[in-house]
């Protein structure tokens, strides 16, 4: 079984700067500057999610992309969320998205 982590443990993980964490979910919003850039980031997120078999909720608007992570099977944050958040943030940086 997957073990939950606290919001503090999530925030201490590498690469998750800019993410907000609560008891059951972590989220961030990226400013993408264009819809096409947002779609490109979603494609990167999709590949990372498939690789990790861990799938975030994403909400793309014209120039923003909001990503929410939670381990639904236990209704809490886990190390899987922190790891994927760090990978998503790295993908955003690679695309020049903040």
Enumerate the predicted regions with their spans.
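Charge-rich alpha-helical segments
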Residues: 1-98
């Amino acid at each position: 079984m997957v073990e939950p982590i606290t919001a503090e443990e999530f925030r201490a993980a590498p690469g998750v700067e800019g993410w907000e964490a609560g008891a059951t979910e972590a989220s961030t919003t990226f400013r993408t500057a264009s819809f096409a850039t947002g779609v490109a980031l979603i494609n990167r997120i999709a590949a990372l999610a498939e690789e990790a078999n861990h799938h975030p909720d994403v909400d793309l608007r014209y120039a923003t992309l909001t990503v929410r992570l939670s381990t639904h099977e236990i209704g809490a944050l886990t190390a899987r969320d922190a790891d994927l958040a760090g990978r998503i943030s790295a993908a955003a940086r690679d695309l020049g998205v903040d």
